[in-house]
């Protein structure tokens, strides 16, 4: 099979395996990366992004049809650089062994953090830079090499990444594989030392099956239907502003975007009014507004319109926030207005499938327990968002629901913090990265026990057994502390 792959050059399946072999060989022959080399890789990644940020923003926008330049610089470039700088600042401390108490006299116990080797990275299209270089911050800090497979849905960005990576890194440090889903399947079947995938749940199942053949450990960053749970104690204007800020950012094409809102039935009209007012102020027009991002491709554009048609057919009321009353459907630039959907029912597609767009279903409740029960009836989401000042209700969300993260009185801000792990649970993913959590994910925590020559750690195991072992066993098997 021929693929468009390694650093932009056509390669076959065997060449992909050979490239991985070269990276593994270099890792073994050159030994674990020391602090100086780790810092060098982090510095080169930072330089690559900063020195080429305008070209990257142009490529991303061309792939989307229109992608806000500021959103690319803020999230993809600045977000990546922040994670890389955090790793650069702390990696020396992270590398230090952890010393532990040894139970045997004369022994020393510690944990050393050893590089895994070569990590495979499969990154998505919605944030094609930060969801590649965010993981790489931990991968490089841990002393690994990496092979990156960016999304085929952003071909200009992926090709530019391949070109830049080849310029800033040796091919045995970081290399790029370009290609479609068939290439992605081949990539995920390689015997990496670890594989991280960011994307949808359905594809993640195939990734896990392929990785299992080589017993490759995986980190899966997925998505799901992240709920917004609004208390009666919440400020509805603040809720609407914070929720709609994220729901319209990148046109809602975010794994952590609010997927539906649960609010008290008497607050529905207030929320709709505040949301409409706020969105109109942010985006007085949509069609030619460079701040408002297009849907990535026709397939996803049609999918979102299918959700709207389905909701209307099943009794939903669709509230399109289109202040300039522009005709968007036939514009050719694939923009969909921010849209609220009320009178929703559980059989609607918008309440059963991850939306990944600027559509926001609103479901009302009478008592807070029913809101909790509704969240728990769904698969575990990547995040849950609670708004309100009622401490009892807040604790119910924290204790009675399970999600990758909980954010109180805000949306998505946790992902900006490298001091917190980023990851899902259940159908929203497994494993985590960011900061020290990424360093640990991409390291082998190797226990080391050093016994002194006079140590007695295994004397009790030596035959013949007599009074000494019986006395020891009586102590070890006692119920007393």
Curated annotation (Swiss-Prot):
UniProt keyword terms in alphabetical order: NAD, Oxidoreductase
> What InterPro entries has UniProt attached to this entry?
Ald_DH/histidinol_DH, Ald_DH_C, Ald_DH_CS_GLU, Ald_DH_N, Aldehyde_DH_dom, Aldehyde_DH_NAD(P)
What sort of enzyme, by top EC class, is this?
oxidoreductase
Q: Does the keyword Methyltransferase apply?
A: no
Q: Which reaction does it catalyse?
A: (E)-coniferaldehyde + NADP(+) + H2O = (E)-ferulate + NADPH + 2 H(+); (E)-coniferaldehyde + NAD(+) + H2O = (E)-ferulate + NADH + 2 H(+)
Active-site residues per Swiss-Prot or TrEMBL entry:
221, 255
Matches recorded under CDD domains = ALDH_CALDH_CalB (cd07133)
One MF annotation (Gene Ontology) recorded for this entry: aldehyde dehydrogenase (NAD+) activity
Write down the EC number. 1.2.1.68
Q: Which GO terms describe its biological process?
A: aldehyde metabolic process; eugenol catabolic process
Q: Which Pfam families match?
A: Aldedh
Per the record, what is one GO cellular component?
A: cytoplasm
Q: What else is known?
A: The enzyme activity with NADP(+) is 4.3% of that with NAD(+).
Which function does this protein serve? Catalyzes the NAD(+)-dependent oxidation of coniferyl aldehyde to ferulic acid and which is induced during growth with eugenol as the carbon source.
Question: Which family is it part of?
Answer: Belongs to the aldehyde dehydrogenase family.
Note the subunit structure.
Answer: Homodimer.
Q: Indicate what this protein is called per its UniProt record.
A: Coniferyl aldehyde dehydrogenase
Origin species, per record, is Pseudomonas sp. (strain HR199 / DSM 7063)
């Amino acid at each position: 099979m021929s693929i468009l792959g390694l650093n932009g050059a056509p390669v076959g399946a065997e060449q992909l395996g050979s490239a991985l072999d070269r990276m593994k060989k270099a890792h073994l022959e050159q030994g674990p990366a020391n602090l100086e080399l780790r810092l060098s890789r982090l510095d080169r990644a930072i330089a690559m992004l900063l020195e080429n940020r305008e070209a990257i923003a142009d490529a991303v926008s061309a792939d989307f049809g229109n992608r806000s330049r500021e959103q690319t610089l803020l999230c993809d470039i600045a977000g990546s650089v922040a994670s890389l700088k955090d790793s650069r600042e702390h990696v020396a401390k992270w590398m230090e062994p952890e010393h532990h108490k040894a139970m045997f006299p004369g022994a020393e116990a510690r944990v050393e953090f050893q590089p895994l080797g070569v990590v495979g990275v499969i990154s998505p299209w919605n944030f094609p830079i930060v969801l590649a270089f965010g993981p790489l911050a931990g991968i490089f800090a841990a002393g690994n090499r990496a092979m990156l497979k960016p999304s085929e849905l952003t071909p200009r960005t992926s090709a530019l990444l391949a070109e830049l990576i080849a310029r800033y890194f040796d091919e045995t440090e970081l290399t790029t594989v370009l290609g479609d889903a068939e290439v992605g399947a081949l990539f995920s079947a390689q015997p990496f030392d670890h594989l991280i995938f960011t994307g949808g749940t359905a594809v993640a199942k195939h990734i896990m099956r392929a990785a299992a053949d080589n017993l490759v450990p995986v980190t899966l960053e997925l998505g799901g239907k992240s709920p917004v749970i609004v208390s009666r104690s919440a400020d509805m204007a603040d809720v609407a502003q914070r929720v709609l800020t994220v729901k319209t950012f990148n046109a809602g094409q975010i794994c952590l975007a609010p997927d539906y809102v649960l609010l008290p039935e008497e607050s529905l009209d207030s929320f709709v009014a505040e949301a409409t007012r706020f969105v109109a102020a942010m985006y007085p027009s949509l069609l030619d507004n460079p701040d408002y991002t297009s849907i990535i491709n026709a397939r996803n554009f049609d999918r979102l319109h299918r959700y709207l048609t389905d909701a209307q057919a099943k009794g939903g009321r669709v509230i399109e926030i289109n202040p300039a009353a522009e005709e968007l459907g036939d514009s050719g630039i694939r923009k969909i207005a921010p849209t609220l959907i009320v009178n929703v029912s559980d059989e609607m597609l918008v309440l059963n499938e991850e939306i990944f767009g600027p559509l926001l279903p609103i479901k009302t409740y009478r008592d807070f327990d029913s809101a909790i029960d509704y969240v728990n009836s769904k698969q575990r989401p990547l995040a849950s968002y609670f708004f309100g000042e009622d401490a009892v209700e807040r604790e119910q969300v924290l204790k009675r629901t399970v999600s990758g993260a909980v954010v109180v009185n805000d949306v998505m801000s946790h992902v900006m913090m490298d001091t917190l792990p980023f990851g899902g649970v259940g159908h929203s993913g497994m494993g985590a990265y960011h900061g020290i959590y990424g360093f640990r994910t991409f390291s082998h925590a190797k226990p080391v026990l050093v016994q002194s020559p006079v140590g007695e750690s295994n004397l009790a195991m030596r035959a013949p057994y007599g009074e000494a072992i019986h006395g020891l066993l009586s102590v070890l098997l006692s119920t007393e502390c």
